[in-house]
C-alpha cells in the first residue's frame, strides 16, 4: 500500500520535523545526524514491509550521496558541488518551513474569521485551486511567503484586531480586477506593496487564488523564484 508516512506530507516535511528537534537555525544543524535519522526512519518502514512513495526514496538516495561525501577521508579537495548539494538541501528545508508556517497561519486566520459568521464554515479556497501555465499553489505560496517575510517588521508595528468585514475576499477580487483593467498586468509584489496589515495581505492573496481558480486571472513566472505576474484572462 502507498502510505502517508506518519503525519508527514512528504520528504521535506519529515526532514523539517527532524531538523526542528535541534532548536537551532536550519544551517546550524548537524546534517549527517539528520540524514542518519531520516534513513533509519525509512529503513524501519521498509522492514515493516510498507511501501513508500517514490519521493521518499529519491530523497533518501540524495541524502546518502551527501552523507558519503561528508564521511569520505579528506584526501582531496572538496568536489565543487559537494557543499552546493548541502546548501541546496538546507535551503529547500528552510523554504518549506516558511511555506508550512504560512499555510498554518492562513488556516488559523480562516478559523478565526469563521467564528464571526453564522454561515457554515467553508474550506480554504486555495486547496482546490487549479492553476494555469504550469504553476502550482506551492509556487504562489513560496512567492507570497518571501514577500511576507520582507514585510514582517511592518506588520508587527501595525498589528491591530481586524474585524472580518473590514477585509472581504469579494471586495479584494474586485480591487484586483479593477487594477488589471488599468495596468494589464500586476506582480504579486506590487499587489501587496501597500498592505499595512497581515489580514489585508492574506485576504488579497486568497482573492488572487480565487480569481485564478475561476480562470479570470492568469499567472506567469519567467524564472525559478522569479516574480509572479498576474494578468487578466481573455474570455
Swiss-Prot record:
Cytoplasm among keywords: yes
Source domain of life: Bacteria
Keyword presence, Cytoplasm: yes
Gene3D superfamilies assigned: 6.10.250.2410, Structural maintenance of chromosome 1. Chain E
Pfam families: SMC_ScpA
Keywords assigned: Cell cycle, Cell division, Chromosome partition, Cytoplasm
Single GO BP term: cell division
GO cellular component: cytoplasm
Chief localisation class: cytoplasm
Subcellular location: Cytoplasm
InterPro entries xrefs: ScpA, ScpA-like_C
Similarity remark: Belongs to the ScpA family.
PANTHER family: SEGREGATION AND CONDENSATION PROTEIN A
Function: Participates in chromosomal partition during cell division. May act via the formation of a condensin-like complex containing Smc and ScpB that pull DNA away from mid-cell into both cell halves.
Subunit structure: Component of a cohesin-like complex composed of ScpA, ScpB and the Smc homodimer, in which ScpA and ScpB bind to the head domain of Smc. The presence of the three proteins is required for the association of the complex with DNA.
Protein known as: Segregation and condensation protein A
Lineage: Bacteria, Bacillati, Bacillota, Bacilli, Lactobacillales
